[in-house]
Amino acid sequence: RMPFVDKGKIGVTGHSMGSWSVNAAVKQDNLNETPLISAVLIHCNDAVYTDDDGNYVNIYGSRDVGIISAVYDEFFGGSVDENGNALQSPYYMESANAQSFLYFGTDPSGKEAREAYTFYTENIDGKEVNRIIYRPGIIHPWSHFSARSEKAVCEFFEKALPAPNPIA
């Protein structure tokens, strides 16, 4: 229907509630025989970390996926520790959810902690797949127009869906 669209390079992103739509789009896309979405950037929201039974899961499959998680986000990035104590957004990288995401949906227990701003790669279905979490030191509403967040958007999509002529 749109011959100018490269169907092998479709990326989706959204800030806050827009990322809920992104996660919903991925779930719907997973029902397609041939998924259309190649790259996902979740912006100030949470990825889908577990299935309905609470087991870690990789709903993103062989897509490149990143998260922009503002350090001082007032709404997202919270979790609980192994004792059930609430962890707020500044401690997101210490959470099992963040670590599971960077370990491609597997249980991170007993594994070395992974860091923000690092692309992690794994072979999934014969494809080299990336995961990254960006942690700009800002609050939730600042993130959608922050130069730090927008730099992350450009970096992520240039890595996931490289332009034929790199963006300068």
Language-model segment annotations:
Residues R1-I167:
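Soluble extramembrane regions of membrane proteins in the secretory/endomembrane system
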